[in-house]
A protein has these predicted regions:
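...captures the hydrophobic TM-helix bundle architecture rather than a specific catalytic motif
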Residues: 1-205
Length: 205
């Protein structure tokens, strides 16, 4: 989708710069909406929106530091960053409505799946997908307030989620399990780590 958007924009609109694309009047140049739709599609697949979230959940076999990078600050953030950049163009468009609906559904569905998960890393993965859905929904609205809300969610999610993944990895190294059912009494066994986890949880919400 991203490659198609670039090629179409270059060949039909003679624009290869995203900043220039954002200044084009979509009403005067119909082809802009095609580029916008393809960019939004590419961004949503990159940011693990339903139904393209399977790869992110499958990455749980990776070591914990790798999971922290994948889920908090690098790969998935590229997609939502692109959506935030093109968010003003999506305001009041069909593309924006679809992006908002898909983001909202992903947020709700991933939250429900997280409730039924006992694996600590997989639970955090569902939480990541859910948070990304909320950011995508904010980007689809296209209002300045929603864009700023999305930006703040990106920052808090990047910091807090990486902290949470590293904490779960530390618990797994000490206890030999990342099942949340085995984490009862953690405040007594590992008080400092438990406090850090609480800070990460508070940062998420």
């Amino acid at each position: 989708g991203f490659a198609v958007a670039i090629l179409y924009s270059a060949l039909q609109l003679h624009v290869t710069n995203l900043s220039q694309l954002l200044t084009i009047d979509e009403a005067a140049v119909p082809g802009v909406m095609i580029v916008l739709a393809m960019l939004a599609f590419a961004a949503m697949t990159k940011s693990a929106q339903f139904p393209f979230c399977g790869w992110l959940l499958g990455a749980m076999v990776a070591p914990t530091p790798t999971s922290a990078l994948l889920h908090s600050a690098t790969m998935v953030k590229a997609g939502v960053y692109l959506l935030i950049r093109i968010s003003p163009m999506m305001k009041g468009t069909l593309t924006g409505v679809l992006v908002t609906l898909i983001g909202g559904f992903t947020f709700f569905a991933a939250s429900l799946m997280a409730i039924a998960t006992s694996d600590g890393k997989r639970l955090l993965a569902h939480s990541t997908v859910s948070n990304l859905g909320l950011i995508v929904a904010c980007a689809g609205v296209g209002l300045p307030e929603s864009v700023w809300a999305g930006v703040m969610l990106i920052v808090f999610h990047a910091v807090s989620k990486s902290l949470m993944f590293l904490c779960v990895g530390a618990v797994e190294n000490v206890t030999g399990s990342r099942n949340i059912e085995d984490m009862h009494g953690l405040i007594i066994k590992l008080p400092k780590l438990a406090i850090v986890m609480i800070i990460g949880i508070c940062g998420m919400y």
